[in-house]
């Protein structure tokens, strides 16, 4: 039951020159729920109807068929619609209970491919907390797109190419110890990388060594290729362990090295179109007409830059997947770079360049401290996830001593807490991470939402009722309507999150639904003898529906929803 559609249809009956789509985009939700469930502003009608908006609203409100509504009234220039709580509420509940997994879904994508590139850690370095944002924002966006009928293709574009990788080889050649690497590959390789960057301040030749090793790799040197394969293998093995903890799974792990094999084609096109210009020994693309700085393609030493691989990658992906959109979930410090990428593709003659979408996000700090792999103050993501699970286990043991699957629930709550904290914040905002605050069962946290649902599931188990097909769902009252009408907003919330590429809309919705349910749980008598059986079953149906919607919302965020906590 789409209340917004009911309003649009009622309005079209008195505005025959307007299409349903034109009306739909004008319909609003009043900030004050006392003003109705939906509102329609009449300002845009003033010019054609040659009347004041207040008069138009009053006239139309009188003409509208109120059969599906409790009331329709004009308030100033707005027409406010109050849905029939009994009939509409029953229809909404029926829709949720009949197909909970698909509730809120809209087939807007029609199966079109959307490439989503996210996480993209550098090989031979551990996944730090800084990778959490890209990984979870990207995964949530992919899930939201799938909910809306698109086919997301998840790509982990590994950072396995570049001069920084040459530095890793140079460091290994100077200080490498195979036994240490076999024992703890990632942290050992990281220590080499940190050391060469630190010592390069006094030994500039170390930077040159790194560039030389990368040049060897580009030209197929066997030793360079051997080291590359080894570093990549041990890194990917470790990454997949973290991805399994997060329940993140990719369709492709092809990285920059794969793209490096295809660089000749974009460079050829750039040369043929006369787009490459010599500048201080390097070759650039002039993007002045886009109000963008020049884009370096070939360095003065003859090595390629990131852009050659990204151009090749974009061309390959369009040819291979025929994408509708190609999304890159990368920090906001890369905004200008992605503008340059799109502009360069346009100059090369690709009309799909505007289908390249950069989803930017703000930096994460830990207890107010910035992180830097180069300086060595990186916070290991796997360690944080394990610590969060331990904290969750401690809280669960205090709340529910006899919980049978406590370890599994602790994983779901602990990891979910970290993920939810990231996604509840608008992605472009910088965020600070404090683990003890994140895992609390109170406040705007993942465990708070999970616990609200678990309370509902406990109530349902105690009732012994699992089938609501014969429930009289018209028996809901004002308290239930507060929950039901809010659940009716779920589809709009998902669509908003999809259109803005902003998972925080889902997280905020889940928090608000949990808050409303906790209030309902505290003030409404359900499993008591003096409550009418039909009313009791209708109330339990509402609890079941809330449980379904919270679980669905958490799933879009890649957060588990345990039935018991």
From Swiss-Prot:
Gene3D superfamilies assigned to the protein according to its UniProt record, in alphabetical order: Arginyl tRNA synthetase N-terminal domain (3.30.1360.70), HUPs (3.40.50.620), Isoleucyl-tRNA Synthetase, Domain 1 (1.10.730.10)
Q: Which family does it belong to?
A: Belongs to the class-I aminoacyl-tRNA synthetase family.
Q: Where is this motif: 'HIGH' region?
A: 121-131
What is the organism of origin for this protein?
Answer: Lactobacillus delbrueckii subsp. bulgaricus (strain ATCC 11842 / DSM 20081 / BCRC 10696 / JCM 1002 / NBRC 13953 / NCIMB 11778 / NCTC 12712 / WDCM 00102 / Lb 14)
Enumerate the subcellular locations listed in this protein's record, separating them with semicolons. Answer: Cytoplasm
Does Cytoplasm count among this protein's keywords?
yes
Gene Ontology cellular component terms for the protein in this record: cytoplasm
- Please give the name of this protein: Arginine--tRNA ligase
Q: What is the lineage of its organism?
A: Bacteria, Bacillati, Bacillota, Bacilli, Lactobacillales
Its top-level enzyme class, in one word, is: ligase
Primary subcellular site in the record, as a coarse category: cytoplasm
Quote the SUPFAM superfamilies the UniProt record gives: Anticodon-binding domain of a subclass of class I aminoacyl-tRNA synthetases (SSF47323), Arginyl-tRNA synthetase (ArgRS), N-terminal 'additional' domain (SSF55190), Nucleotidylyl transferase (SSF52374)
Does the record carry Chaperone as a key word? no
Q: What is its EC number?
A: 6.1.1.19
């Amino acid at each position: 039951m789409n209340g917004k559609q009911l309003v649009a249809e009622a309005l079209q009956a008195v505005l025959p020159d307007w299409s349903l789509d034109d009306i739909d985009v004008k319909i609003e939700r009043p900030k004050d729920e006392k003003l109705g469930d939906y509102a329609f502003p009449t300002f845009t009608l003033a010019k054609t109807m040659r009347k004041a908006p207040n008069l138009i609203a009053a006239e139309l409100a009188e003409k509208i068929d109120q059969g599906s509504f409790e009331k329709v009234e004009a308030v100033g220039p707005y027409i406010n619609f109050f849905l029939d709580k009994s009939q509409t509420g029953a229809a909404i509940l029926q829709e949720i209970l009949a197909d909970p997994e698909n509730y809120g879904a809209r087939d807007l994508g029609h199966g079109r491919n959307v490439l989503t590139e996210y996480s993209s850690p550098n090989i031979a370095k551990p996944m730090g907390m800084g990778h959490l944002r890209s990984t979870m924002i990207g995964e949530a966006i992919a899930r939201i797109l799938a909910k809306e009928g698109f086919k997301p293709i998840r790509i982990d574009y590994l950072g396995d190419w570049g001069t920084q990788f040459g530095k890793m080889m140079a460091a290994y050649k100077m200080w490498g110890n195979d036994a240490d690497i076999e024992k703890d590959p990632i942290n050992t390789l990281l220590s080499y990388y940190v050391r060469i960057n630190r010592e390069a301040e006094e030994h500039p030749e170390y930077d040159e060594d790194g560039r030389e090793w990368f040049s060897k790799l580009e030209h197929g040197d066997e030793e360079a290729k051997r080291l590359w394969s080894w570093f990549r293998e041990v890194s990917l093995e470790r990454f997949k362990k973290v991805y399994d903890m997060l329940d993140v799974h990719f369709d492709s792990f092809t990285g920059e090295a794969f793209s490096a094999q295809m660089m000749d084609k974009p460079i050829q096109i750039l040369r043929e179109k006369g787009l490459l210009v010599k500048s201080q020994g390097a070759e650039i693309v002039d993007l002045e007409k886009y109000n963008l700085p020049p884009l370096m393609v070939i360095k003065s030493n003859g090595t390629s830059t990131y852009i050659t691989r990204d151009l090749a990658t974009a061309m390959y992906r369009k040819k291979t997947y025929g994408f509708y959109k190609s999304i890159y979930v990368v920090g906001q410090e890369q905004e200008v770079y992605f503008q340059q990428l799109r502009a360069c593709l346009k100059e090369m003659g690709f009309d799909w360049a505007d289908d390249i979408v950069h989803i930017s996000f703000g930096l994460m700090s830990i207890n107010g401290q910035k992180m830097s792999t180069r300086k060595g103050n990186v916070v290991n993501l796997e360690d944080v996830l394990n610590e969060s699970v331990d904290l969750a286990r401690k809280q669960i043991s205090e709340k529910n001593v006899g919980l049978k699957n406590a370890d599994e629930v602790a994983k779901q709550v602990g990891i979910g807490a970290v993920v939810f904290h990231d996604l509840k914040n608008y992605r472009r905002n910088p965020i600070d991470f404090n683990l003890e605050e994140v895992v609390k069962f109170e406040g705007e946290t993942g465990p708070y939402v999970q616990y609200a649902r678990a309370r509902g599931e406990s109530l349902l188990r105690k009732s012994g009722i699992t089938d609501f097909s014969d429930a009289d769902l018209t028996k809901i009252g004002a308290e239930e309507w507060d929950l039901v009408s809010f659940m009716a907003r779920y589809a709009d919330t998902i669509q908003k999150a999809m259109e803005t590429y902003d998972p925080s809309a889902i997280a905020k919705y889940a928090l608000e639904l949990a808050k409303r349910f906790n209030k309902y749980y505290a003030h409404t008598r359900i499993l008591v003898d003096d409550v009418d059986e039909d009313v009791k079953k209708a109330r339990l149906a509402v609890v079941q529906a809330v449980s379904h919607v919270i679980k669905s919302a958490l799933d879009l965020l890649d957060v588990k929803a345990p039935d018991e906590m």
